[in-house]
Amino acid sequence: MTEDELNKLLLAGKIAAKARDEVSLDVKASAKVLDICEEVESIIIENKAFPSFPCNISINSEAAHYSPTINDEKRIPEGAVVKLDLGAHIDGFISDTAITISLDSRYQRLLDASKTALEAAITNFKAGLSIGEIGRVIEKVIRAQGYKPIRNLGGHLIRRYELHAGVFIPNVYERGLGVIQSDSVYAIEPFATDGGGEVVEGKSITIYSLKNPNIKGLSSRENELIDFIYTRFNYLPFSERWLKEFSTNVDELRNNIKNLVKKGALRGYPILIEIKKGVVSQFEHTVIVKGDSIIVSTKSL
């Protein structure tokens, strides 16, 4: 990792933290999800970075992957538990962070469980340690609070222009995941729930990424859209909202996206729902492993 790469990672983390901490104050009952996410993304762009992925706002039993669509009218309900998940990148060097806001004080202990688990995981995180041991730490902290970790969600290795780079950081103990590597970047994200401790895919898809830009048999318009996506986002996730420059015809745009997913050119990420409709909390930081040191790039300013 060069000094220039490290500086870009640190700045991307600082910008994401700024957006997270400022916009989390605007998460209130009746607020439009679209307004919140557009504010997040605007702050990132105003600070000369780009969103690493579309801002996620997942409410109550929604664990992840809800991002508002074009003209989305969804609002934050009274008493909601709201996960705000966002990231920034500079030249493909990525940050990823999340916070949970509860509009009902009854869920504060649930929030504390995932937040304390994140703090414990970071304290124990170091090069050479078994990745499974981080899962053990997270699971122990969450269960001690009387909740369940979500076993099929977790953190991940991050590489340039690659948000999920193949290494999984579990929320429970697992064998055979290798060890934490120096000169690497990881997202750590404990999820806690009062439900069953697992997520399943919902029907809605609001986030996409490029899967295979070389699929044969695409129409000229579909190829134009693929080129537009690659030029602007590389292989990072994107929202239909970010394609309005390509087409202002929403129905045409959605139809093209749907067809490109079916043909295997794009990948869709379904919303993830807690299996027993339990309420979910999440906290997340990006950590940079540099020699024997750990740098939390997304810590509050």
Curated annotation (Swiss-Prot):
Top enzyme category: hydrolase
TM segment ranges: none
Entry binding sites for a divalent metal cation 1: D85, D96, E284
GO molecular-function terms, A-Z: aminopeptidase activity; initiator methionyl aminopeptidase activity; metal ion binding; metalloaminopeptidase activity; metalloexopeptidase activity
Signal peptide boundaries: none
Cofactor: Co(2+); Zn(2+); Mn(2+); Fe(2+)
Binding site for a divalent metal cation 2: D96, H156, E189, E284
Entry's EC annotation: 3.4.11.18
One of the Pfam families matching this protein, by short name: Peptidase_M24
Disulphide bridges, residue numbers: none
A biological process from GO: proteolysis
Catalytic activity: Release of N-terminal amino acids, preferentially methionine, from peptides and arylamides
Keywords: Aminopeptidase, Hydrolase, Metal-binding, Protease
GO cellular component: cytoplasm
Cofactor binding mode and count: Binds 2 divalent metal cations per subunit. Has a high-affinity and a low affinity metal-binding site. The true nature of the physiological cofactor is under debate. The enzyme is active with cobalt, zinc, manganese or divalent iron ions. Most likely, methionine aminopeptidases function as mononuclear Fe(2+)-metalloproteases under physiological conditions, and the catalytically relevant metal-binding site has been assigned to the histidine-containing high-affinity site.
NCBIfam families in alphabetical order: met_pdase_II (TIGR00501)
Protein family according to the UniProt entry: Belongs to the peptidase M24A family. Methionine aminopeptidase archaeal type 2 subfamily.
Self-association and partners: Monomer.
Name by which UniProt lists this protein: Methionine aminopeptidase
Gene, per the UniProt record: map
